[in-house]
Each structure stands twice: as C-alpha cells, then as structure tokens.
C-alpha cells in the first residue's frame, strides 16, 4: 500500500493513529480571518463594513461628512420616494412586523401576498410567481428544489455566489463554461446530454440576465435557441435586470424578446425595488411545485406584511412611471460615454452597472479609494485581490435615477485626477490605517 496510508499493509493503521484532530474554532482562529478577513485591521469600518448614514441616495454621510455616493443598487430612486416611505409606514402601523405569523403553508398566507404574486407574474410575462423571503436564500432554494442527484447542471463561470452556493448542495454532476462562451456551452451541453442518458436525469442551465460585477448581459436569446438541439430547463437570475432592462423594465429576457424560452425566472426586490425579498416565476405547475416543496419557505416565516405592502407600491410605481427608468438610462449613458471619452476601461457593460478597470495591487487600490473618499468626498465600491486576480482593480459605479448630470461630470473629473496619481506611482505606499480601530483611537 502506498500514498497517504504508507507503503505497508500496516500503513493504514499507522497513519490513522498519527492523524491529529483539529479543533474547528482553533482552526478559524489561526487562519488569519480568511482571504478577505486577513485585512480586517486595515479595512473594517472603512473599506469593508463602512457605515453610510442619512437618507438613502446620492448624498449620504460617511464618517461625519457628506459624500457623493455611487455604491447603492437604488436604480430607480425608490428607496426614499415619498409614496414608498408612506406605504412602508402604513404596512408597519396596520400590521406590524410580526404579521403574518408562521410559514405560508401553515398560517402565514394573506390576500396581499397572493395579489403581489399575481401582479409580479403579469408584469414579467409569466403564468405565476412565488414570493421568497430573501434573494440569496431564494436562489439556493430554487436550485435545491429543482434538482435530483440524477440531474446535471451547466452554468456560467461568473455566476453569482448564491448560484454557486446552490450548486454546492447538488449531489449530481456540474459542468461549467467560460463566461458567455456559447461554443463552450454547446460542448458542455453535449457532455451533460451523454451523462443524463446514463443517469436518467435532466439538464438545468443557469446564467444571469445582467452580471452584477461587469454589467454585461447573459446571452439569453442564444441559449434559448440551443433548445432546438438540446433538451434542458433554463433558469435565469435577473436580479439586476428587473426594473432596468427591456420594455417597461420587465427584465433582460424581454430585452432579448425570449421570455417564453426562460423556464424559471428569478428576480429580487433588493435592487430596483429598493426593498427586501424576491420571487421566482414560471408556469403554474412549476410554481405550485415550489410552493409545496421548497423547504426554505415551508419551514420559514412568511414575508412580513410591511415588506409586502411596500413591494406592491414599488411595483405600481415601476409600472406607472417609465420616466424613472428613462432618467436612470440618461445618467447611465452620460456616465459611461464620459468614461469612454476619457479613455477609461469600462469593459463590455450593457447595463447601468459601470465597472472602471485599473491596474494595481491591494495597496494602490486602498490608497486610491482613500483619496476618492477623503480628498474628493466621493464614495464607490472597490474590488481587488483576492476577489479578482492580482494586479487588477475594479471601481464599481452604480448610477441611479436620482443622480444628476453634474454628479456625473464631477465624478469623471475626480477619476481623471486619481488615475494621474496612480500612473505616477503616488499610491504605491502602505495601506492607509483608517479602519475603525485606528479611527476610534484617534478620537480618544
């Protein structure tokens, strides 16, 4: 016997006797906080877990001073819309956060939940919809509910973390194709088709309508067209497309005019709706299957009434005020064209999500963002290693309907000034010590 268990028949016993049990909590204590947590002393409260204060919008306070904020998915500006705030308040006063008590299958069903589902399904062009308590949890639950160990999944390599976590629960075979590479998708579909002939299962293809980091679109129409050659069920996560893409904001599948070819459509309330919760929609038999088999909804409390009442008002505003979406796209086009005119790399975004790509390490990224926030009073999100490859920086800008063209012009000028400093090497210094622990020490 060789390898892990040694070179003799007794090697198995010998090496098992010498395996040292590890305490889980000690392992966590000794691993320096994980790939991102290792920076906690530098990042917490500033680069990670920053505290933005005030009404949600383009102007908020960060550490006591006003900043121009480009870091919220409040696409249509509904978070502080007076009618939305009023609906949220009415829901809280009339029903409270406790209502309805229990899971919907047992005691948590209301006519308002049913009305919201009917209206959502009609808006996105599907037969029925089912409310989910949270988007992240909802996607995990959809995947878990759909699949058996006999099934195969084919998914985009840049799928959101909620999709990846859902796939981790799947005990069958998984096939991944490079981001938006349709030729490779065909190859993986062929492999999956051969596999399920042996297992007696089916194939699920998963992608996103709008990819939230890069802003590019999933090639939904091309994937739907592949149904002529392959038998599969198509699941689309359209979290960033709902309310922003397609005619009347009905989503990315409508943008591509292929909604009938999307079998399972997922959307969240956390972006354009500026709320909490999510929904999945499709044919009635499928949604009924989810209602009676999705464990995260069977064994969890129903979505609270203030969120349901608030969601009804938000949907009404999306349906009746196309000018909000038009304004979003006016700001988006001005921002993205401005970056292109100044020769910034914003990749292949076709949505409001605007990534600005720069070159540099963690130190340069943190010093650049520190400069934006402290010198220019401009707040945006930064992504760097280990989330993306070493040497890359992404500054993620999210335009909204409540930003102004003056905000766009100011931001473009700020980025131009920071790029000049980056190219001169002025950000090649130690990470700034601005985490809460240092901030609090200085305040004493």
What are the functions of these language-model segments?
Residues 2, 90, 94, 118, ...:
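PLP-dependent enzyme catalytic core of the Aspartate aminotransferase-like
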Residues 2-21, 25, 29-98, 232:
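N-terminal "arm"/small-domain region of PLP-dependent enzymes with the aminotransferase-like
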Residues 48, 325-336, 342-376, 385-387, ...:
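Conserved PLP-binding catalytic core of the aspartate aminotransferase-like
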Residues 142-161:
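Conserved PLP-anchoring active-site segment centered on the Schiff-base-forming lysine
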Residues 149, 169-171, 261, 342:
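Short, structured coil segments at secondary-structure junctions
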Residues 175, 179-236:
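Active-site phosphate-binding strand-loop segment of PLP-dependent enzymes
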Residues 230-233, 240, 245-350, 357, ...:
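Active-site C-terminal subdomain of aminotransferase-like
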């Amino acid at each position: 016997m060789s390898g892990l268990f040694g070179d003799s028949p007794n090697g198995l016993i010998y090496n098992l006797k010498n395996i040292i049990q590890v305490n889980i909590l000690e392992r966590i204590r000794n691993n320096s906080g994980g790939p991102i947590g290792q920076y906690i002393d530098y990042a917490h409260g500033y680069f990670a877990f920053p505290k933005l204060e005030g009404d949600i919008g383009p102007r908020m306070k960060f550490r006591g001073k006003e900043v121009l904020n480009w870091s919220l998915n409040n696409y249509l500006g509904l978070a502080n819309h007076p009618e939305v705030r009023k609906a949220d308040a009415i829901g809280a006063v009339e029903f409270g956060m406790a209502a309805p008590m229990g899971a919907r299958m047992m005691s948590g069903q209301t006519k308002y939940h049913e009305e919201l589902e009917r209206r959502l399904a009609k808006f996105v062009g599907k037969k029925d919809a089912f409310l989910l308590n949270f988007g992240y949890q909802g996607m995990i639950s959809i995947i878990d509910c759909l699949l058996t160990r006999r099934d195969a999944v084919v998914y985009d390599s840049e799928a959101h973390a909620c999709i990846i976590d859902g796939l981790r629960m799947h005990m069958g075979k998984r096939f991944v194709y490079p981001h938006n590479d349709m030729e490779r998708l065909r190859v993986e579909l062929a492999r999956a088709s051969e596999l399920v002939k042996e297992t007696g299962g089916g194939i699920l293809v998963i992608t996103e309508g709008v990819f939230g980091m890069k802003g590019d679109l999933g090639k939904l129409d091309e994937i739907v067209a592949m149904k002529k050659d392959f038998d599969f069920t198509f699941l689309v996560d359209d979290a960033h497309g709902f309310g922003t893409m397609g005619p009347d904001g009905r989503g990315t599948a409508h943008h591509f005019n292929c909604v009938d070819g999307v079998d399972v459509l997922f959307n969240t309330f956390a972006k354009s709706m500026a709320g909490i919760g999510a929904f999945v929609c499709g044919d009635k038999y499928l949604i009924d299957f989810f209602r009676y088999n999705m464990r995260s909804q069977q064994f969890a409390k129903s979505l609270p009434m203030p969120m349901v009442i608030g969601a009804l008002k938000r949907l009404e505003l999306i349906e009746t005020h196309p000018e909000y979406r038009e304004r979003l796209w006016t700001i988006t086009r001005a921002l993205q064209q401005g970056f292109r005119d100044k020769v910034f790399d914003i990749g292949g975004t076709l949505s409001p999500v605007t990534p600005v790509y720069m070159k540099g390490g963690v130190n340069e990224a943190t010093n650049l963002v520190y400069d934006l926030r402290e010198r220019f009073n401009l707040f945006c999100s930064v992504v760097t290693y280990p989330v993306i490859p070493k040497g890359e920086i992404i500054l993620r800008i999210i335009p909204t309907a409540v930003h102004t063209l003056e905000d766009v012009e100011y931001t473009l000028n700020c980025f131009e000034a920071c790029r000049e400093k980056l190219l001169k090497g002025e950000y090649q210094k130690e990470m700034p010590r601005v985490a809460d622990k240092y901030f609090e020490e200085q305040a004493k």
